């Protein structure tokens, strides 16, 4: 279901969103936020977070920078494992206890590696 949701949002971005004026009050845009949520969260958590984000995206709210926040537990041994940094897609920036901001790695930085 997550893959279907991501493909549906990608279809919206590619074919429908370009026909409409840019009106999202947040960075990342609501559709990009939804894709990040579905890539890093469970389906229902991502759906709820996306739904709440779309409800906040109007003239009654200030807008601004609003990265997805996920809950994640890392194993301590994970830190010491050798990993391939070329496959890093997201940075998890600590926010609160086991909650992290999700920040997408720029494609330009991926190409340099």
UniProtKB/Swiss-Prot annotation:
SMART domains named in the record: Haemolytic (SM01234)
Membrane topology (UniProt): Peripheral membrane protein
Pfam families found in the cross-reference section: YidD (PF01809)
Record-level GO cellular component terms: plasma membrane
Compartment list: Cell inner membrane
Swiss-Prot/TrEMBL keywords: Cell inner membrane, Cell membrane, Membrane
Residues spanning the signal sequence: none
Function: Could be involved in insertion of integral membrane proteins into the membrane.
Homology family: Belongs to the UPF0161 family.
Protein name, UniProt field: Putative membrane protein insertion efficiency factor
Organism of origin: Campylobacter concisus (strain 13826)
Lineage, opening ranks: Bacteria, Pseudomonadati, Campylobacterota, Epsilonproteobacteria, Campylobacterales
């Amino acid at each position: 279901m997550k893959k279907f949701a991501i493909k549906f949002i990608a279809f919206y971005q590619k074919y429908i969103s370009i026909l409409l004026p840019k009106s999202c009050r947040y960075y990342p845009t609501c559709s990009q936020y939804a894709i990040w949520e579905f890539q890093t969260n469970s389906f229902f958590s991502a759906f709820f977070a996306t739904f709440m984000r779309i409800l906040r995206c109007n003239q009654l709210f200030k807008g601004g920078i609003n990265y997805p926040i996920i809950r994640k537990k890392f194993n301590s041994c994970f830190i010491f494992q050798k990993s391939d940094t070329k496959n890093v897609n997201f940075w998890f920036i600590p926010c609160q206890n086991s909650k992290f901001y999700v920040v997408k790695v720029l494609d330009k930085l991926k190409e340099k590696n």
